[in-house]
Amino acid sequence: MRMVRQLAEALARLSGLRAAGQLDQAAEELDAAFASLGGIDPRLAREADAGLLLSLVQDPSRREALLRLLEERDRLRAARG
């Protein structure tokens, strides 16, 4: 349950930063979330294919968190153009 709360908080922060146009800060927040919630090195998370990243995570809760973070990664990329 703790991970769900942490994920919700991280996604809310990311959404707020993205909406405010603070894209660099959103990217930093996303990196931190990939490491703490997804268990993935942020450098890998920035570059790797979603399918590969999801295959690296066995825990269902972490996999779900990673999926949500990958969706946010795509939104951030779209916001950057």
Regions found by a protein language model. Give the residues of each.
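Conserved small-residue packing positions in alpha-helical repeats and bundles
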Residues: L7, L14, L67, E71-G81
